[in-house]
Regions:
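Beta-sheet-rich non-transmembrane sensory/scaffold domains
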Residues: 1-219
Length: 219
């Protein structure tokens, strides 16, 4: 067992005790590498989904991450976070794909490919957790919700294809008739949209992609 709040506990908790409550969970499927003896856990974001002002350091450490756990000891070998201080419900929705990546010279690298709700695909060395495909930390906008804190940057997996996470513009709005199109454009202009990591607020904002689109639960 792995309890992120009590790493020393690798089995059932003693009588009358429980595992740490409220930690980021794993709601999708997991993957296992028999050669490395590692279980790969795609974690969810800490609750509540869209406000993180009361989250603990533990919540922020392991939320929306790939966590590699030794199957024998229950200890964490490495972890890699795909969304910092997740305020968008961008938890990891599918099991990591394990693949041996050839270099064209007879050598392969054990990699892990992880999809995400925000339309980014991350490729990591599954032995070390280091990115194999380039990832950039890019500045993202901050919000002004009282009691909230914001990560100044987010990881962008620029070395892999990005799907469906473009910053929307008025010209992207659609309607079956000119009237529909006009109404859609008016609503868009009335909302705040700052790209994929638009921070939630008390005003009208547009989150795109949303937490139920691009790549979600399943293989």
């Amino acid at each position: 067992a792995w309890d992120p709040g009590n790493p020393a506990l690798t089995g059932e908790p003693p009588a009358g005790q429980t595992y740490t409550r409220g930690t980021p969970n794993v709601w999708s499927a997991m993957s296992y590498d028999a050669k490395l003896n590692l279980i790969y856990l795609p974690t969810g974001n800490a609750t509540p989904d869209f406000f993180g002002g009361e989250r603990t350091a533990l919540d922020d450490k392991y939320s929306s991450s790939i966590v590699a756990v030794d199957a024998t000891t229950g200890q964490v070998r490495w972890h890699y976070q795909t969304t910092h201080h997740d305020l968008w419900d961008f938890d990891l929705p599918s099991q990591p794909l394990l693949y041996d990546l050839p270099d064209g010279k007879g050598v392969t690298t054990p990699v892990l490919v992880q999809t995400s709700k925000q339309g980014m695909i991350f490729m990591l060395n599954r032995a070390t957790g280091e990115p194999v495909a380039k990832v950039e930390e890019r500045p993202v906008p901050a919000g002004n919700v009282k009691g909230e804190r914001y990560s100044p940057t987010q990881p962008y997996s620029v070395g892999m294809p990005m799907i469906g996470n473009e910053t929307l513009t008025e010209s992207d709005m659609w309607g079956a008739t000119p009237v529909d199109l006009l109404l859609c454009r008016i609503q868009f202009k009335e909302m705040r949209h700052q790209g994929v990591f638009t921070p939630p607020g008390e005003d009208r904002s547009l989150q795109y992609p949303g937490s139920l689109v691009v790549m979600n639960w399943g293989s």
